[in-house]
């Protein structure tokens, strides 16, 4: 048992299954669960966990929460109504806060505008209209443990 730190969880296939099992390692109240990631797709299995939709499943209407996931709301960090602390930190936020490790002009040249928004500005990809949505591609993946 101990603290659980899960990095890049928006890129883990079958995230809900992993979370259900791994969270048991930090089930005692003295341990912490910390999840952090660059966003992937709105259809990723981790999105309901991030958005609060997972918390709302099976709850009465009066007990459901509505979480404002906007950058302006979450940039300073916020303990939300579902008990999760959420924070969005973009590369531009980091630079404004004094981090001098990034060359934003170089990053804008290196990444396409869509990649920059997704990977560095914490915007989710809406792949619902894609020819191959992420959820369908993940269904084609092979798990070497199976």
Each model region followed by its residue ranges:
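Walker B catalytic acidic pair
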Residues: 7-9
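ATPase catalytic-site recognition across NTP-hydrolyzing enzymes
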Residues: 79-146
